[in-house]
A protein has these predicted regions:
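Structural beta-alpha unit
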Residues: 1-8, 82-122, 238-274, 311-312
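Small/aliphatic-rich secondary-structure junction motif
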Residues: 2-65, 90, 166-216, 220-223, ...
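Glycine-rich, Arg-bearing micro-motifs that act as flexible, cationic patches
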Residues: 10, 105-106, 121-143, 161, ...
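Ordered, small/hydrophobic-rich secondary-structure cores
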Residues: 35-116, 120
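General small-molecule cofactor/ligand-binding pocket signal
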Residues: 41-43, 93-98, 153, 198, ...
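Short beta-strand elements of ligand-binding domains
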Residues: 124-126, 151-158, 304-308
Length: 312
């Protein structure tokens, strides 16, 4: 059986790291995704010490010392990370990006480096409290999601795959829109021949005071739209030759939303990667409006691949 094919194959993976355990977990996860022929760029961006130290006279020596220490720590972090990929049969390169030279924030530096290298996906380890999650907070998320010009893969700090090797369960959130279908194309680049592919559409059943259309009528309309969305994605999944399944997921009638329902289903199904397009319609779009990566990072219990719409 031939490997699953994708209109947008994954060939170049950028991994953003820092000294935190979250980055180490993300690196271990990436190791299981790589296949021979892929290229990996490990990037450690360091802050400009002038931004975190008071601007007082005669501080140049202190700034130089701080910068040297940051560079030393970054190099040690890169060496530990590179060691994880020994024997992986992929081309590996690494770089330290110094924002005191490039200017801008760490997110700016990562976005620029990732774009210049031509990455297909940028991987970031995420923790709700510290580490690189700050990159997906507020305006930072806009920088990575728009300027990097590639998919963004967030790996929760608490997530650990039960086994190494190719993905066994790959889940797609679909809504029938072109960005949603494009996300499926990109996500299929991580599928191996044995990967089970699951496309899910979420029907929002949550009652809101602003609803003026009868709830049952809305549910029926959303369900019909869901069936259509799943029918549109079916040929793409079947063309891979992989085992596939499709399903409609429903939110709870009250105190629930699409994001939580989707993540619950991903966890229940034991998804090893959830793929989401960032410019879809209705429920999915509502989830991803605003601080895209921040919202996902705080909810995610499984790795999430955020895929920008074509031409965005």
């Amino acid at each position: 059986m031939q490997p699953a094919q994708s209109a947008r194959s994954i060939a170049r993976v950028a991994l953003a790291i820092d000294p935190t355990p979250e980055s180490l977990s993300a690196a271990r996860y990436v190791r299981t995704l790589l296949r021979p022929g892929m290229q990996l760029r490990i990037v450690c961006a360091i802050d400009n010490p002038r931004l975190v130290l008071p601007d007082i006279p005669r501080i140049d020596a202190l700034l130089t010392s701080a910068r040297e220490e940051m560079t030393h720590d970054a190099q040690a972090t890169i060496e530990r990370t590179v060691a994880l990929f020994a024997g992986s049969d992929v081309a590996i390169e690494h770089a330290i990006v110094d924002t005191s030279i490039t200017g801008g924030s760490v997110a700016d530096a990562l976005a620029n480096d990732t774009s210049q290298w031509g990455a297909d996906v940028l991987v970031v380890g995420a923790n709700p409290h510290h580490g690189l999650l700050r990159l997906v907070e507020g305006a930072m998320s806009d920088t990575l999601a728009t300027r990097a010009h590639c998919a963004l893969l967030l790996v929760p700090a608490s997530y650990a795959r039960e086994s190494d090797g190719p993905l066994q369960r790959l889940m797609f959130a679909v809504d029938g829109s072109e960005p949603s279908l494009h996300a499926v194309e990109v996500g299929l680049g991580f599928a191996a021949p044995q990967t089970l592919l699951y496309a899910a559409y979420v029907v929002d059943r949550a009652v809101r005071l602003t609803d003026i259309v009868p709830v049952r009528a809305l549910e029926n309309a959303y369900r019909a739209e869901g069936e259509d969305a799943l029918a549109r994605v079916a040929p793409m999944l079947h063309a891979t030759g992989n085992p596939t399944r499709r399903g409609i997921v429903e939110t709870r009638p009250t105190s629930d939303d699409v994001a939580h329902a989707l993540m619950r289903d991903a966890v229940h199904w034991h998804a090893e990667l959830l793929v989401v397009g960032t410019h879809g319609r209705r429920g999915i779009a509502a989830w991803l409006i605003g601080s895209v990566a921040r919202r996902v990072a705080h909810l995610a219990e499984v790795p999430v691949l955020l895929v920008r719409g074509q031409g965005r």
